[in-house]
Amino acid sequence: MIRSLLIIMAIAFFPVASSAQGITPKAATPEMEFIMQLNVTLGEAYTVGETQAGRRHVIPITGGVFEGPRLHGTIINGGADYQLTSVDGKRTTLEAIYSIKTHDGINIHVRNEGIVYSGRDSDGKETFYFKAAPRFEAPADSKYAWLNNAIYVCSPSFGQPGTITLDVWMVR
């Protein structure tokens, strides 16, 4: 009886496994367009403490500049990066909320959510992953309203102490 059940399960699973290996995407691979580089200055981080969800940290965003092919300006003091680190310390989710001001005086709200992971991957290799997905809220009647209608991804990098650089791309 058990042997028959195992054979039936193997036969039922085989078509799924073989078809999954040969999947061909039907849609075109998304293209990326570089939008801007943000050079963010950070204040002194502080810890809220252990919560039910993990260890909460806050990093004030104190300013900076941004530049790209279609816009440039400053990062407004007053935002923060709210981070939540897992109990094992390997995974941190982040939510940075701040505003930028374009060179011509338009304020744009930014909410950037991401993941930082440091640990072993499925092959057992040490890995470090840090990516985020910013969303922009520009005034609907501004020349920057195009920012409201797309998906963005960013790759962070570290420079001088107290700074972080974010390269932002639009997914086309």
Regions inferred by a protein language model and the residue ranges of each:
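Bacterial N-terminal signal peptides
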Residues: L5-P15
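Beta-strand-enriched cores of mature, soluble protein domains
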Residues: Q21-R172
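Sec/Tat signal peptide C-region and signal peptidase I cleavage site
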Residues: V16-A20
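N-terminal secretory signal peptides that target proteins for export/translocation
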Residues: M1-I2
